[in-house]
Amino acid sequence: MAAYLLAVAILFCIQGWPSGTVQGEVRPFMEVYQRSVCQPRETLVSILEEYPDKISKIFRPSCVAVLRCGGCCSDESLTCTSVGERTVELQVMQVTPKTLSSKIKVMKFREHTACECRPRSGSRVNIGKHKRSPEEGEREPSSPLTPGSL
């Protein structure tokens, strides 16, 4: 077993880590950015959270992988929101503890097909110019980010 683990470790060193980059290699900005934007991405969802009325059953697996919106938006007042959905049907094993019976069951899950950054519920987003009262005064323009300012 130890020889197997050593061989796997050596293979990772030669071929690179599973993420696609060699350990210690810097991932390019555009790859980092593209992977972080608001988009449908594989997410593990608990079956019992999707079907709370089935609490008396046991499911295997207990969670399933579906596409759900996730990622970063350009502004704190925005959140990554689904704007398109479809229904997918997945096979899972349902176990009934009382009778110790099990069967393969097809269950439906929502999967997101398109995402957008939209205002958070309850957030006040100003569209256009906001007129300030004399008590508020003028606001100083924010300074742009420079490479050394972070």
Curated annotation (Swiss-Prot):
Sorted UniProt keywords: Disulfide bond, Growth factor, Pyrrolidone carboxylic acid, Secreted, Signal, Toxin
S-S bonds: C38-C80, C69-C115, C73-C117
Region (Disordered): 119-150
List of residues that carry Pyrrolidone carboxylic acid (Glu): E25
Tissues expressing this chain: Expressed by the venom gland.
Disulfide bond found in the keyword field: yes
A Pfam family reported for this protein in Swiss-Prot or TrEMBL: PDGF
Any one Gene Ontology cellular component term annotated for this protein: extracellular space
Leader sequence segment: 1-24
Main location: secreted
Bilayer-spanning residue ranges: none
Gene3D superfamilies: Cystine-knot cytokines
GO biological process: induction of positive chemotaxis; positive regulation of angiogenesis; positive regulation of endothelial cell proliferation; positive regulation of mast cell chemotaxis; response to hypoxia; sprouting angiogenesis; vascular endothelial growth factor receptor signaling pathway; vascular endothelial growth factor signaling pathway
Database matches in InterPro entries: Cystine-knot_cytokine, PD_growth_factor_CS, PDGF/VEGF_dom, PDGF/VEGF_growth_factor
Propeptide part(s) removed at maturation, as residue ranges: 122-150
GO MF term (any one): toxin activity
Subcellular location: Secreted
Keyword Disulfide bond applies: yes
Family that this chain belongs to: Belongs to the PDGF/VEGF growth factor family. Snake venom VEGF subfamily.
Self-association state and partner proteins as the record states: Homodimer; disulfide-linked. Interacts with high affinity with VEGF receptor-2 (KDR), and with a lower affinity with VEGF receptor-1 (FLT1). Does not bind VEGF receptor-3 (FLT4) and neuropilin-1 (NRP1).
Known role: Snake venom VEGFs that may contribute to venom dispersion and prey subjugation by inducing vascular permeability and hypotension. This protein induces an increase in capillary permeability after intradermal injection, as well as a drastic hypotensive effect after intravenous injection. The hypotension is mediated by nitric oxide (NO), which is produced by VEGF-activated endothelium NO synthase. Also induces angiogenesis in vitro, probably through VEGF receptor (KDR/VEGFR-2) signaling.
UniProt name for this protein: Snake venom vascular endothelial growth factor toxin barietin
